[in-house]
């Protein structure tokens, strides 16, 4: 030890110049080396930093940073102490085990298998010329699809397909870049003009999906509007929830469709405080519907913006398929066609509407529609729009054609509603529990994740019917269900086959029927003596109308090509 101290005194500037320090070190010669090094103003500082980094998650890399600090601090010395510290760091990096990443993945997956929320994907290849049929892995293994969101079967519409083929042949497979770099084209402009016209807004902006649209718009609002408070329905889609998280602002979650609670929350803030109410028109897993008009009343009373997701409503409601907001003033919009009625409608009152091209419109993509300033603002600031490659030209052309086609084909919406009613009435006669709602969704309550999966498997393997089980986290635990979505192509004959199959499944698995839920006090409106049923959104009079009852301007509309997404020229 004496020789080490003498050698160190020749090398270390601190020990060489400070007699007192030399004596301190000699007194500690029987202590361990870290204790001695701590006395040095150079190594002591380096070791303090190393201890701080070692306590963090970055472990080895942080220790290396501490070594770098020590090296810088003692740059004038070629000391063996520096070499010792470096060796200590290397030893730390090589001897400690790495984090068990694969173990984490395995553990999380095991949890999902244990609670029956693990997702199994079925190989379903929908056949354009045999809708609603699909084949599985083998082409002769065919099933009837009863859970697709292709609500109007427009993905197989020949007019849509022909437009896509011609566009593909002329313009190729991809857009070539973002809207800012080579990806801005006439197809985007035409599609956005169609969407703005559909919702009777000043502009629209297309995204790669409505998940991205919801996330991008909501998060941008929260990040750019100082002190914004967001009020969100508890059953809002995951895309809206993610957007609210990314908004990094204050939020309140109100009980589903509970407008009394929403008003209580809004009243907590001065009218001058910026606010956003985020909600959906049709909630896809329950079929429940928001009271858009009353929510707009609250928004105007308390100074809030309204953000309406019409993903599961566009194409299905309103005389022209613009959604529930249009349906609220059905006759006025029908008589006006693509023009605006002479009074301020519910759709006019909503500040921003988002929707999808991937459900009723049969293609893929999402969008937001709103005022000219809002659309230009989102175009200019939203990373989810700015840094995303544009949708392929053929997709945008097909989506625009689908919007045009369904706008003048009221019968598509009517057939979908009639087929939905036929299935709901038939299941009610069998005592099979359908969660009551006024929309096109047929949620059949099971209430158990394992049994819901079994029911889906029996339908597929025995009856050649595909209905996906819906489990947590898509729905709350204990409310697992089968979600059935009739289309214009699901005839009454096919519906009869479905209902016979469900009767067999319910009998085989001894699943609870309506009377069983009644005995338990009811759940989600099933067997609940206090449940007040809502009338269907579509009235009997609306279902008797024909395509000829629509305004002529919807059939050969002159739609002005908007330039909002090109940049507004003041």
UniProtKB/Swiss-Prot annotation:
Gene3D superfamilies, alphabetized: Aspartate Aminotransferase, domain 1 (3.90.1150.10), Type I PLP-dependent aspartate aminotransferase-like (Major domain) (3.40.640.10)
Protein species of origin: Kluyveromyces lactis (strain ATCC 8585 / CBS 2359 / DSM 70799 / NBRC 1267 / NRRL Y-1140 / WM37)
Keyword set includes Repeat: no
Modified residues (N6-(pyridoxal phosphate)lysine): 359
The name this protein goes by in its record: 5-aminolevulinate synthase, mitochondrial
Transit peptide: 1-53
Source domain of life: Eukaryota
Active-site positions on this chain: 359
Taxonomic lineage of the native organism: Eukaryota, Fungi, Dikarya, Ascomycota, Saccharomycotina
A GO cellular-component term linked to this record: mitochondrial matrix
Gene that this polypeptide is encoded by: HEM1
């Amino acid at each position: 030890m004496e020789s080490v101290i003498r050698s160190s005194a020749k090398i270390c500037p601190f020990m060489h110049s400070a007699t007192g320090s030399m004596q301190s070190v000699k007194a500690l010669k029987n202590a361990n080396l870290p204790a001695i090094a701590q006395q040095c103003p150079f190594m002591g500082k380096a070791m303090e930093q190393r201890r701080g980094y070692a306590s963090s998650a970055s472990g080895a890399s942080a220790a290396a940073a501490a070594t770098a600090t020590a090296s810088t601090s003692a740059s004038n010395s070629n000391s063996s102490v520096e070499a010792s510290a470096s060796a200590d760091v290397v030893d730390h990096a090589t001897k400690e085990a790495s984090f068990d990443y694969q173990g984490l993945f395995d553990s999380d997956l095991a949890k999902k298998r244990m609670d029956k929320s693990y997702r199994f994907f079925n190989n379903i290849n929908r056949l354009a010329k045999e809708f609603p049929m699909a084949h599985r892995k083998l082409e002769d293994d065919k099933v009837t699809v009863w859970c697709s969101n292709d609500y109007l079967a427009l993905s197989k519409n020949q007019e849509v397909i022909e437009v896509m083929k011609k566009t593909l042949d002329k313009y190729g497979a991809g857009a070539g870049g973002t809207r800012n770099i080579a990806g801005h084209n006439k197809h985007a402009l035409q599609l956005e003009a169609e969407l703005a016209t559909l919702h009777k807004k000043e502009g629209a902006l297309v995204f790669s999906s409505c998940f991205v649209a919801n996330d991008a718009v909501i998060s941008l609002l929260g990040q750019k509007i100082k002190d914004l408070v967001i009020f969100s329905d508890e059953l809002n889609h995951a895309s809206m929830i993610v957007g609210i998280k990314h908004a990094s602002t204050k939020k309140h979650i109100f009980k589903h469709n509970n407008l009394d609670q929403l008003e209580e929350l809004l009243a907590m803030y001065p009218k001058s405080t910026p606010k956003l109410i985020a909600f959906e028109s049709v909630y896809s897993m329950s079929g429940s519907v928001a009271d858009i008009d009353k929510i707009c009343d609250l928004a105007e009373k308390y100074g809030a913006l309204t953000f309406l997701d019409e993903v599961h409503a566009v194409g299905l409601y309103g005389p022209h398929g613009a959604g529930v907001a249009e349906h609220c003033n059905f006759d006025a919009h029908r008589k006006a066609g693509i023009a605006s009625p002479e009074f301020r409608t519910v759709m006019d009152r909503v500040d921003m509407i988002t929707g999808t091209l991937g459900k009723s419109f049969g293609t893929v993509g999402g969008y937001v529609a709103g005022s000219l300033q809002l659309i230009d603002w989102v175009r200019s600031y939203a990373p989810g729009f700015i840094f995303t490659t544009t949708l392929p030209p053929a997709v945008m052309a097909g989506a625009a054609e689908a919007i045009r086609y369904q706008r003048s084909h009221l019968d598509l919406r009517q057939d979908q509603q009639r087929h939905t009613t036929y299935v709901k009435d038939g299941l009610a006669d069998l005592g099979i529990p359908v969660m009551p709602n006024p929309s096109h969704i047929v949620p059949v309550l099971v209430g158990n994740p394992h049994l819901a999966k079994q029911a889906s498997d029996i339908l597929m393997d025995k009856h050649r019917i595909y209905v996906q089980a819906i489990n947590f986290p898509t729905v709350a635990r204990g409310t697992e269900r089968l979600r059935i979505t009739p289309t214009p192509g699901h005839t009454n004959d096919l519906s009869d086959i479905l209902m016979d199959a469900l009767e067999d499944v319910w009998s085989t698995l001894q699943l609870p029927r309506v009377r069983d839920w009644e005995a338990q006090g009811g759940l989600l409106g099933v067997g609940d003596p206090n449940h007040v049923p809502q009338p269907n959104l579509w009235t009997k009079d609306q279902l008797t109308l024909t395509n000829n009852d629509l305004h002529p301007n919807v059939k050969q509309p002159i739609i002005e090509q908007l330039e909002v997404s090109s940049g507004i020229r003041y």
